[in-house]
Amino acid sequence: HVACHEAGAIEYSGHKVITVPQYKGKIKAEDLKNCLKTFWDDESHEHMVFPGMVYISHPTEYGTLYTKAELEEISSVCRSYNIPLFLDGARLGYGLMSEETDVTLPMIAKYCDVFYIGGTKVGALCGEAVVFSGNRTPKHFLTLIKQRGALLAKGRLLGIQFDTLFTDCLLY
């Protein structure tokens, strides 16, 4: 998804998207591990783009869902290589309510370093709630947001939507 359907937004910001094989939008821990091992085993890796984060979506654009076991395996690979796991939660409300998933919000917080809870696809006017698991918010995060022109004046009002969506389980 992020490699082709976001108009190059990641690369526009100066980062490089390195793809691994996908299967209906999902990646496998084994493929990820092979990709990372290949990178680190290459004697010239110091001259290459370093893998800096793993990005997954739940549900994917194909509607496929990760299982708890898959999420745990991918997280384990990320932690063994000391790179964060990011979960795109634009459709997270739908994924958590699916009868086909065994993934819960606490599991996502346990296995992912960063994720966001999408709002617009579940009834919010706009916005996503970014969650840094385990109190790992980057240093000076608010300043970084402002430097990139993404800090909205009175933006805290958008948070009220999420407070409401989490009341009486309206989010899912």
What is each model feature region?
Residues 1-4, 33:
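Conserved PLP-anchoring active-site segment centered on the Schiff-base-forming lysine
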Residues 5-15:
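Active-site-proximal loop->helix
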Residues 34, 69-80, 103, 107-110, ...:
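Alpha-helical scaffolding segments of alpha/beta enzyme cores, especially the outer helices
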Residues 50-58, 65, 103-171:
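Active-site C-terminal subdomain of aminotransferase-like
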